[in-house]
Amino acid sequence: MRVTYLMRCLAMMRGGGETQHLAWIRALAKLGVEIDVITGRPLLGHAVYPPEPDIETTTLRSPYAREFVYRTQSWRGFGRLTMWSLHGDEELFCRLAFNRIAARPQQPDLVLAHALHQAPRLAPGTYPVAVYLPGPPHTRYIPDLQRADALISDGYAAKQLPAMIGRHVDDVLKGVDIDTFTPDGPNERAVQGLEGKKVVICVTRLVPIKNLPMMLKAVALVRQRQPNVVLALIGEGPQKPLLEQQARELGVADAVRFVGYLSQSSTPSWYRSADVFALSSDFDNSPNVVLEAMACGLPVVATDVGGLREYVNPPAHGVLTPKGDADAFAAALLDYLNDEDRARATGRDNRHAAVTRFSWAVSAARMRDVYARVIDEFARKRSAPREVAS
């Protein structure tokens, strides 16, 4: 079985979607599935992230509008412009990707398009196309998605999307590498000068939907009662200058560490340095980072949005607060920072849940079965005799 993944942003940013697909690709390879990736970089400039050495990757030059969208989507009057910019960028990337596939001597058995909703409409029809949906699409894409050979999602989104799109969505839960993400091992406290600090860690892209301004407000409130608090922000994104300015205005610039992007192999030591994991998103389907934090034995404080309850069952695994409520978020953080016994007990429960409920091997086997079914259905559909009109 050979599958080609279309991942528009893999060379330019690394968020939860990109990370989870890389994990799936590696787990599927162990099951004998051959996978290559087509991604894009800007017309001018270079890719931010080089190809993964163990994954066959093709990088196409095309406009890259996502940075523009992130920077301007909250500007008054720019909503329609940003939507059309992103649509045009993704549409062109899909066309270029399908042209590149057509030029290959061997065609894939299946193409998986990550959040590229127009791909089924643009595909040549000589192989099946599945679309992975990390969350609800814009309604304009529903006709395109109804043409897909399969739709795949997980958790909350997989439960909500069938009613919206009007067709079946395969639910393939994510996993976590419990051997890499573990409470045991080196941490960064001594190296980073965090000894004696109360460390809150957030691993995320610095983009508007993550509502990091609310988290900074919460940290400012926490600091009033816990002066040793430090927030470690792991990730990159266009909102970094805005967040740095806000931290200065709130008087917490010295309590916020902008660590930047870290590879998965470098992230566990930071999780082990923390007392609590925090996520302030306005929406998240089922973020990988929550599973990583749980596997590392951390309690979780997050906003009660999307599919967070798929992983976090309060109070056993953490606290979920109302979206945008900095006071409630700060109170939940303080409960763990000021009660080490409670934090450790919750962390133990989270590690147990990660080990017993989530596994990339199980998840990849489920994904392989979905691919095999879609390929078989497509082949039978193409070989079925067609009725001739009289």
Listing of model-derived features with the role each one plays in the protein:
Residues 182-194:
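A short helix/loop element that forms part of the nucleotide-sugar donor recognition site in Leloir-type
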Residues 19, 23, 198-224, 231-233, ...:
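A conserved mid-protein helix/loop that constitutes part of the nucleotide-sugar donor-binding site
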Residues 157, 175:
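Carbohydrate-associated surface elements
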Residues 261-262, 269-274:
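Short alpha-helical donor nucleotide-sugar binding micro-motif in glycosyltransferases
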Residues 299-302:
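Short hydrophobic beta-strand element within catalytic cores of glycosyltransferases
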Residues 282:
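Aromatic "clamp/platform" in nucleotide-sugar-dependent glycosyltransferases that forms part
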Residues 244-261:
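Nucleotide-activated donor-binding/catalytic signature segment of Leloir-type glycosyltransferases, i.e.
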Residues 314-315, 319-326, 335-340:
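Conserved acidic donor-binding segment of nucleotide-sugar-dependent glycosyltransferases
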